[in-house]
């Protein structure tokens, strides 16, 4: 039995049948054109993506975590999204977690066979002490990865919310999740190479999940990352510029309040907008559930 026969990500793309004989310029044009399928796939899944983000936001507001879990490219994309959240939003590294079949070493070197054992998915979730407050997002372009299915089964068994993200219709993993996103960008230019359009599609979905979930818990004011962690010179300068943009003050004033606020962009903004001291700004934020109210 051919288990991959009817999976969208394994089909041949008729537009790239002659990829090996195309000029580089022709192949570049083809690959650019093929990316339009990604946006159409996302538009088609608008409602499902929205439902997932409402669920992740609910989990975060109630003390839960977002857990991405996948194998290969899908697992790496989850890790990429997760590790960017602490510096961008000043959340704990355990707030959004990325897990990959084969462990951390699989991020830079493929661990053959790791994705084929459903029990590994369960064990990886147990290792981070998964709770019913958490939301587990299983990612698999093919929609059938045993590692992901095992993780979703375990998450369901303890009452955690579950999500399946795939790039094929009627994906097997969707049957194991409360919410599912089946975004199908079409066959790859290089047959079966899901690091291409499927990977791009998944990355854009994860971008939306993490960014808009953070918006929902007060990590953004207007469109500014007011909880940015100033860990290098670029981010220190960005922090001061954010204070300028949010309040309309000049750079010198922004820098003064930034330092008075112990280098917290959010607190500096509240101090300026409310003409108050540091302690009062903290109290205002606490009263507003850490949202800036202008």
Swiss-Prot record:
Its EC number is 4.2.1.126. It catalyses: N-acetyl-D-muramate 6-phosphate + H2O = N-acetyl-D-glucosamine 6-phosphate + (R)-lactate. Pathway: Amino-sugar metabolism; 1,6-anhydro-N-acetylmuramate degradation; Amino-sugar metabolism; N-acetylmuramate degradation; Cell wall biogenesis; peptidoglycan recycling. Belongs to the GCKR-like family. MurNAc-6-P etherase subfamily. This is N-acetylmuramic acid 6-phosphate etherase. Homodimer. The active site is at residues 84, 115. Residues 56-219 form the SIS domain. It holds the Pfam family GKRP_SIS_N. Keywords: Carbohydrate metabolism, Lyase. A lyase-type mechanism (elimination/hydration) is suggested for the cleavage of the lactyl ether bond of MurNAc 6-phosphate, with the formation of an alpha,beta-unsaturated aldehyde intermediate with (E)-stereochemistry, followed by the syn addition of water to give product. One of its GO terms (biological process) is amino sugar catabolic process. PROSITE patterns: GCKR, SIS. Specifically catalyzes the cleavage of the D-lactyl ether substituent of MurNAc 6-phosphate, producing GlcNAc 6-phosphate and D-lactate. Together with AnmK, is also required for the utilization of anhydro-N-acetylmuramic acid (anhMurNAc) either imported from the medium or derived from its own cell wall murein, and thus plays a role in cell wall recycling. One of its GO terms (molecular function) is carbohydrate derivative binding. InterPro entries: Etherase_MurQ (IPR005488), Glucokinase_regulatory_CS (IPR005486), MURQ/GCKR (IPR040190), SIS_dom (IPR001347), SIS_dom_sf (IPR046348). HAMAP family: MurQ. It comes from Francisella tularensis subsp. tularensis (strain SCHU S4 / Schu 4).
